[in-house]
Structures are given as C-alpha cells and as structure tokens.
C-alpha cells in the first residue's frame, strides 16, 4: 500500500537513500532539492505549493512537488519528481502527480514541467507539454 505524506519541516525519513539512488542514475534533482531546502530558498510554502513523499510500507519510494511558476502569472510547476527503481511501474508517480494537481487552487491549473518529463505525462492524462516559450492560442 502506498501512503502519501506532506513534507513540511524536514526532509522525509529515507531521503538520503532516495537521493543516493537518484544520483546513481545521474539525476541531480534531489541534490538540488536538498540544497534549496537547506538554504531556505525553496520550502514549498507559498500558496498552492506542496512537496509530497510516497511511502511503501515504511520505505520512502518516491517524492515530488509543485511550486509557483514565476514565468507565467498564476501558473505552477511540477518539480523534483523521483521514484526509486524498485517502486517504478506501480503508479506511484501518477498518485503523487494527481495528489499535487488536486491541491492546486481551482481558479488556475496551468502547470508546467521540464520538457524531458514529457514521456511521463501521458499516464496521468495531461498530454505532451509545449516548450516554455509557446503560449496557448
């Protein structure tokens, strides 16, 4: 069973292990998360922002967040998503993403992602992303 918990005060239990896994796959997003958290630059505290940890049993299986997108007024950005290899293909990223989307203010649900994340978007029903320089017609 997968349990989602908000991350508010400190990095979640098991963060060092998930960070090592990400680094071993040459992903640096969790190093950036740790650095930004420690400096206070990003704590996911603005209205609509959230960082969620996904646990399988008591093991940290995944993490993901949503922040205010400064490039577009009223928009948000999915970021710092990672699911540990043994827990992939179990719907954890989908659960994280949907929970984060449900927590956004209903007035505006424009969400941006890094273009390299497009292959992960279809399973949650959001389709391919446009480049950040493209605008809706």
What are these regions (language model features)?
Residues 27-53:
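Active-site rim helix/loop that mediates acceptor-substrate recognition in acyltransferases
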Residues 53, 59-68, 77, 82:
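Conserved beta-strand in the GNAT
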Residues 1-17:
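Conserved N-terminal entry element of GNAT/NAT acetyltransferase domains
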Residues 88, 111-125:
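Conserved beta-strand-loop-alpha-helix junction that forms the acyl-donor binding cleft
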Residues 48-49, 73, 78:
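Short coil/loop residues immediately preceding or within conserved phosphate-binding loops
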Residues 112-114, 127-137:
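Conserved catalytic-core motifs of GNAT/GCN5-like acyltransferases
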Residues 83, 89-102:
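Conserved acetyl-CoA-binding loop-helix of GNAT-fold acetyltransferases
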Residues 15-26:
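Hydrophobic alpha-helical core bundles mediating ligand binding, dimerization, or RNAP-core interactions
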């Amino acid at each position: 069973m997968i349990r989602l918990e908000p991350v508010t005060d400190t990095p979640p239990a098991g963060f060092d292990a998930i960070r090592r896994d990400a680094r071993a796959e040459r992903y640096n997003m969790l190093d950036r998360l740790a650095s930004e958290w420690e400096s206070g630059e990003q704590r996911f505290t603005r209205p609509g922002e959230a960082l969620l940890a996904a646990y399988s049993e008591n093991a940290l299986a995944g993490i993901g967040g949503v922040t205010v997108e400064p490039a577009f007024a009223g928009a948000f950005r999915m970021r710092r998503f990672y699911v540990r290899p043994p827990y992939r293909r179990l719907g954890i990223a989908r659960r994280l993403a949907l929970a984060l989307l449900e927590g956004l203010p209903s007035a505006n649900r424009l969400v941006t992602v890094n273009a390299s994340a497009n292959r992960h978007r279809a399973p949650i029903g959001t389709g391919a992303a446009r480049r950040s320089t493209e605008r809706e017609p």
